[in-house]
Amino acid sequence: MPQNADSLAVVLKCRDWENPGVTQLNRLEAHPPFCSWRNADDARVNRDSAQKRSLNGEWTFAWFSAPEAVPESWRTSDLQQADSVRVPSNWQMDGYDAPIYTNVTYPIPVNPPFVPADNPTGCYSLTFSIDADWLQAGQTRIIFDGVNSAFHLWCNSRWVGYGQDSRLPSEFDLTHFLLKGENRLAVMVLRWSDGSYLEDQDMWRMSGIFRDVSLLHKPATQIRDLRINTRFNDDFSRAVLEAEVRTTGERRDDLRVTVQLWDSETFVGEKTAPLGSEIIDERGAYPDRTTLRLNVEHPALWSAETPHLYRAVVQLHAADGTLIEAEACDVGFRQVSIENGLLLLNGKPLLIRGANRHEHHPENGQVMDKETMIKDILLMKQNNFNAVRCSHYPNHPLWYTLCDRYGLYVVDEANIETHGMVPMNRLSDDPVWLPAMSQRVTRMVQRDRNHPSIIIWSLGNESGHGANHDALYRWIKSEDPSRPVQYEGGGANTAATDIICPMYARVDQDQPFPAVPKWSIKKWLSMPGEQRPLILCEYAHAMGNSLGGYAKYWQAFRQYPRLQGGFVWDWVDQSLIKYDDDGRPWSAYGGDFGDAPNDRQFCMNGLVFADRTPHPSLYEAKHAQQFFQFALLPGAECQIEVTSEYLFRHSDNEVLHWSLALDGNPLTAGVVTLDIPPQGRQIIALPALPEAETAGQLWLTVRVEQPQATAWSQAGHISAWQQWKLGEKLATQWPQHAGNAPQLTSSGTAFRIVAGEKRWEFSRQQGVLTQFWIGEEAQLLTPLVDQFTRAPLDNDIGVSEATRIDPNAWVERWKAAGHYQAKAVLLQCDADTLASAVLITTAHAWQYQGETLFISRKTYRIDGNGEMQITVDVDVASGTPHPARIGLSCQLAQVAERVNWLGLGPHENYPDRLSAACFERWDLPLEEMYTPYVFPSENGLRCGTRELLYGAHQWRGDFQFNISRYGQKQLMETSHRHLLQPEAGTWLNIDGFHMGVGGDDSWSPSVSAEYQLSAGRYHYQISWR
């Protein structure tokens, strides 16, 4: 007895999900998103179409360990054990199966095209009704915008088709499957398919119907494709809108196509032509298509700065004017080109201020909603980003529409990555895999080509370089010559890219890896015969407490025109919310779901946390990328030169606030309106500035504010700022106490000093300050001791983990040398009474396994006013690794509500990441001095500090500090921030010197030499009262 062609058994026998030659069955051709309006005015204003219906919502769902476990009866009716889930969603976020986070390593055994027999399978079903008029005429389609990883579709128990490529739509014709009354859809989704070998991106591996599902009803004769291009004369004063329209359905001689162009409510013009009017070659024209050209005088040009959009409405109608169907899209008049080694937009060289962005939501997984998309765009714009790379797959279709409207340049990237293959180009150089790769590239272009925000196509990510790439590069250049193509794989400079687009190339340092060397970005420009622009597809790995040295990249970008910026890795931490036994949420990373293999916290590389609150590094990026640059001009008068890096917009909504302050105390201020043309300058002459009358540092600060709200910012938004230290009137010390010295007493174990209501006790056996009283209140919970270590940053750890030690990682070097285990050996502890002060002198050798790592000498000078001046000299052994810090640490007994300091702030800053910080007097709650990185580490440092006030205490000097309820030991030993427990009192770290955080990448030591503590001797001094 022959098998039913619709049966599960037939589908299982074919095993299409293990055949790279089968990427779809019965799927319709790719095209731009359609709405099939039946009223041209509805199309013009983008009104909801009555011909489009969402199927999002509650679906019936059953989960199985493998497709073979799905009962045949499911195809025809819901199973008794079925539950319900919301579509779109990832089933792992609903408690089925586990998400897996891995970066390079495939989550399944590598045996392409085969996948494990244990292949989790989700069975979805939905019952719905169809309007009677949809059944009478026309075509009804179903559109799945994203399903991971592959799926088969049935309608009313009849098999419809198959699709894979999780990040592009699969669209099927349901017309002949639909019935009057209720209809039932059944969708069998497989977690793994041969397509999974092309989707080895650095992200959580999740499954399910995770993008929108909708029905679309089109007439029998219909628009099947729409391609929009804009062309210009030399000075962009005249343009041509070119609309290529393709149709399908009944052949009719009376069909006409009209394109109308609107500028908001203003009608610009229209053009009408019959089908078949465009002669292609000597054999004639395509009978089902036409190309319409509409001249536009003085078009308003689109750019990320000025995202002016027109609206094109395309109508298919009969000769008598009867409208059959209308489609529409936003149109941006803009031109992308590469000339003389520069990437140009509308004839101007771009400077890409970009971020790589994964589609990630902490609670919804890879399901993106409009609100989150808009939040990302607004944050990018507010922080001076102008570009985004869709890493590493085509995004939700709404994303591009929003980028068009708000103004972001987009690199649209094919859903291809084979990072875990050995060699990496194993599939991209295999012709068997060309059809699968081709579908992912060509369908992306066919869906997204009409978006002006997309300025570059990308062939994918980290898939080596093979003949398949070369073929697909040539296809795109033929199909869409209006955009360049980039591809990093195989060394960033192969023939398959128009742009040199390396990842993690450094500014001045070569990384001569075998086969694929990463030269410094400066060197790359001078390679023989190389004339392409260089735009880093990934740089500045923002993992945890990172982004050190970011300003150095931007100095290079501004110095060398062909260095045209790059895309930070990456935008958002990919942590996921889990709940503890008491229902409290916490942030999870790789391994927290029992997932194996996993790459632990490597999924958290964002400039923002998963909930989109900023990392401190975001402020550094904002400052480095700001569109206004400032220079303090030399001369007797104080003049500031403001340069605009905007290419297309006049500064019509900016005022410059300037202020002069002495040690944070305002002296004078003013406001000037900025009136700067694109790429222009304005000189601002300030009035005569007052001189400092008392000791302190004189700082001039300028801030650019937008008085009026914009589409992406609120009124009062600060877009740029800069500070200059104009001078310093020195007072080398506080006035020395001229009265009697404090009282010094000693015993066999301690030195005790009394000055008024203050008392100090130093251990003679340990040589440290063990206690400090104010009145009867003890101020210390732990002694004041040297500190040379920090709770490791992600950049300090690199790729090291328990099962794979990288001896070159900073933390492993520090461990091996004994920095964390070193013990202090007392060399000296003396006390002397001077005329007006008591002097305690100590010396320690910090040793590990008999080796001396550091020698620390301290002098404590305590006067009768109760001021203790601490002078520290540290010698670093020549053979030991450069230390993380040179400073002091103690646990204060007091827990005060606020912290006040004069120094750089307000946000966390480190020696190689402090360009965005300003020198002022700051005051913040104690809890805001801690940065809640999901993976705990050293955090919260404030550099350039002159004074610190906390509770009853005051410190002065030139130092860096962090202060919080969490000690370095707990930060080092705790895996997740929600496990941290506030400790007794407050931990204070005061550093004379602190190593940078690095960030060129996070897997090799990346702290630049100038920010390492490489000197043999260090000296610093603080006063405590």
Curated annotation (Swiss-Prot):
Top-level lineage group: Bacteria
Cofactor: Mg(2+); Na(+)
Gene3D superfamilies linked: 2.70.98.10, Galactose-binding domain-like, Glycosidases, Immunoglobulins
Enzyme class: hydrolase
Binding sites annotated in the UniProt record for Mg(2+) 1: E417, H419, E462
Keywords from the named record: Glycosidase, Hydrolase, Magnesium, Metal-binding, Sodium
Residues annotated as binding Na(+): D202, F602, N605
Presence of keyword Transcription regulation: no
GO molecular function: beta-galactosidase activity; carbohydrate binding; magnesium ion binding
Family: Belongs to the glycosyl hydrolase 2 family.
Protein name: Beta-galactosidase
Species of the source: Citrobacter koseri (strain ATCC BAA-895 / CDC 4225-83 / SGSC4696)
